[in-house]
Amino acid sequence: KNRENDGNRYIAARAGQLSPETSYVLHRFGMRQPTYVNNIGTRVRDMDIRKIPGISDDISMKKAWNMMAELNAVTLPIVDEEDRLDGIITINDIATSYMENQDSTIIAQAKTPYRNILETLEAEMVVGDPEAVFERGNVLISAADPDVMEDYIHQDDMVITGNRYESQLSAIESGAGCIVVCLGAPVSRSIRKLANEHGCTVIITPLDTYTVARRINQCMPVRAFMRREGLIKFLPGDYTDSIKDSMQNTRIRDFPVVDKTGHYIGMISRRNLLGAKGKHIIL
């Protein structure tokens, strides 16, 4: 059959023990016994496995959201440096993080990399280390007079401010760990020098205060909200009949496929299960 060159590859197989007559004929013509196959059911490898790229656990929530929009996906796999599956994050996880987390310390609790903040706020760091992490302090907006704000700013806080010299000076002297200057306002040399002496990071963003306040939570790394425990994942050799219940009894829509060593291969969905193509058999 393979000599027909029709683009398919055919493999001889048997479903049980060979009869003595069949064994004799195969031996007589120098043919190997066909491979024993006890189940010809459809497997995960027969499904349309979608090659959604894995992401690092330190990318921002905003970047993950944008990737979902670009890929038309609702779930992203999170992998380590060796491409082993570490977890997943869904579009619902991201939406929930926006709606339910109102704690002003959540940015620090998530150990947010400054490079995420710079990317999300379209910002430039003029004092500080872009590879550092914001891991202590609250986030607050300097909306009152400096004399009033001094009572609210604590050590290592992130202060969102404008172009007022006095507000920037007050934040640094009050122990702020970072000030975010909005509307692209220039920061004077004296403020930069003072910030450097106090170990205060200075970031300039072209965005307005309202937009910065909206986006700041989107800077957090996905690891803060990713799902690690109880992941439903499948192997390429799993039979589709055996995975149906697992796929149907959860709200998750997409499921990762990994090899035996845990390396990520791709994603499958319930829709892929319905469209899975069975093996073609010639009797």
Predicted segments, located by residue:
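Short hydrophobic alpha-helical runs that function as membrane-insertion/retention elements
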Residues: 11, 34-36, 76-77, 158-161, ...
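Short, ordered loop/turn segments at secondary-structure junctions
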Residues: 15-18, 41, 81, 91-94, ...
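Bateman/CBS regulatory modules and CBS-like beta-alpha motifs in cytosolic regions of diverse proteins
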Residues: 35-67, 79, 114-127, 131-165, ...
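Long, charge-dense
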Residues: 104, 192, 197-227
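A short, polar/charged loop-to-alpha-helix boundary motif
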Residues: 91-107, 213, 271-283
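A glycine-centered beta-loop-beta connector
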Residues: 47, 68, 76-94, 247, ...
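Short, glycine/polar-rich helix-capping loops at beta-to-alpha or helix-loop-helix junctions
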Residues: 21-22, 186-193
